[in-house]
C-alpha cells in the first residue's frame, strides 16, 4: 500500500539492513561553536531514524565567501555568511536554491531578511540574524531622548558640555548613512557594475551636512578603540553596533542609552539618517552530497527556537518575527535601538567592492577639512571611481 512520508527520500536505506550514514560539515564563527554544537546535538536527537555524522568547523560569517571560493569541494555543506556576500556566492554557483519548506521560511522571517537572502526573487539562504547594522549610543546624563533625534541639537549640547559626538565618517559603511537617508541608492547594472547616485542634488545636500558635521568642534572620528576609550568621559555619543554594547554599558553605567540615528538638516528640511542593514544567513553548499538533509539541518539551525537561543546566548537580533517580538529583545537597550533604526536601513546586498575606497577617501577629505576642491567635484570624482569596474 502506498503511503506518503515527510522523511527526505535520502533517509531511505542504501541497501536492505544497512542505512547510509549522512555526513555533513558545518561552518560557524568561533564564538558560536559551543552553541552550534548544542543545536546540532538537538537536531540529531530529533531525527533518530538517520545515522548522522555532523562535524563543526570554525569559519566566520565574514570569511565564508573567501574560504568557500578557495576550494568549493572542501567547503562545509552548511555555512553561515554575511548577506552582502550572497550575489558573489550565487554568481559562483556556490549555493543550493532553497527548495524545501521555502514558504514557511519566508513566512517566519522578516521581509528584509528574506530579501537579503534572495537573488532575483529566488531564496538562496536561511536567515539567522538581523543584527548587522548601526545606531547611536549616548550618555543620558548629557542628552535626553528628544535631544538625540536631532544632530544639530546634539552638537550644540555637546559643545556646551565640552563633549564630543563620535562617528567614523572616513568609513564607507558609516558615511553612507547621510546619502541613504536623503534618497541615495545602490544598484548593479546589466554588466554587473556598481551604480550610485550620490552626486545628484540630494547627494550634494547630504555632502553639505557631512561637511558641517565634520567641521563642528564637537565632532570626533576614529575607530572602535577611540569610541570605547572615550565614551562616558570625553565622548557623549557615538555611532556603532551591537558588538560594542557590553563596552558601552560598562563605560556609561546608569547613563547607558541608545537610539536610532538622528536627523540632520538640509536646506529642504530635516532628514532621517539611513544605515546599512545586514543579515547573517545560512547557506547550503551546491556541491553537498546530501542536499535534502543539509537543507533540513539549515532549516533547523535557523528556526524560531534556535534564533531565540542565539539571542539568549549571543545577544544577536533574530530575523524570525516571533523571536524578535520577545520581551527580552525589546528590553535589550542596544538591540531595541537597532530595531528602531532598521526601518531606515538599506540592504548591503547591492553594494560592490568598488564602493568602499572612494567613499572612505571622500570622508577622509572632509574629516581633514580639506576644502580645496568643491563638494560637487568631490562627489563626481567619488561616483566615477565607484562606478569604474574593478580591475580597470
Where are these regions (language model features)?
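Extracytoplasmic "Venus flytrap"/periplasmic binding protein-like
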Residues: 42, 46-109, 146, 236-237
